[in-house]
């Protein structure tokens, strides 16, 4: 069976790379994982992931998209498709491949032909009104993550407002509030992966 592809999108600095690092560390030994990172002109995210995550370097491929990072995950996915084929060739037993977008705006979405599921992550420092803007990335993602909740008191953000707005535009679709530096809220992300993505015996009772 082909690995499941999970896209991870969000603005620059929201915590996309850190989310992959935390997920792979938590699920290490439980499932087989790899990652593809997209950057406009560098391979910086791939280097950070190789340095900080439990993934071996040959399980990480960096893609230099050039221009608009949105194009590489939506209109022309050929570079990511090639990276996916290469990483599966290296590791045919993979369960999940994460595809991290380059930092993008609130309207960024993944092509359904590129990924099977998508996560969209923002951070509290961008302001409590961000969920209210209901960008396509936040609306269409399978899981919405509001990260860096610890910063709320310092930026004047009301987490209860962000939560209410998220419930309003997400409806029944899940969202999680996290502080990835301490792994607070990470259990919600892991539960979603086990139960909604893998739908296997890994599901927590």
Curated annotation (Swiss-Prot):
Residues the record lists as binding GTP: 10-17
What cellular component GO annotations does this protein have?
A: cytoplasm
Q: Name one Pfam family in it.
A: cobW
Disulphide bond pairs: none
Q: Where in the cell is it found?
A: Cytoplasm
**Single GO molecular function:** GTP binding
**Keyword vocabulary terms for this entry:** Chaperone, Cytoplasm, GTP-binding, Nickel insertion, Nucleotide-binding
Q: Tell me which domain of life the UniProt entry assigns to the organism this sequence originates from.
A: Bacteria
> One of this protein's GO BP terms?
urea catabolic process
Q: What is its main location?
A: cytoplasm
Family as reported in the entry's similarity comment: Belongs to the SIMIBI class G3E GTPase family. UreG subfamily.
- Task performed by this protein: Facilitates the functional incorporation of the urease nickel metallocenter. This process requires GTP hydrolysis, probably effectuated by UreG.
How is the quaternary structure described? Answer: Homodimer. UreD, UreF and UreG form a complex that acts as a GTP-hydrolysis-dependent molecular chaperone, activating the urease apoprotein by helping to assemble the nickel containing metallocenter of UreC. The UreE protein probably delivers the nickel.
- What is the designated name of this protein? Urease accessory protein UreG
Q: What is the lineage of its organism?
A: Bacteria, Bacillati, Actinomycetota, Actinomycetes, Mycobacteriales
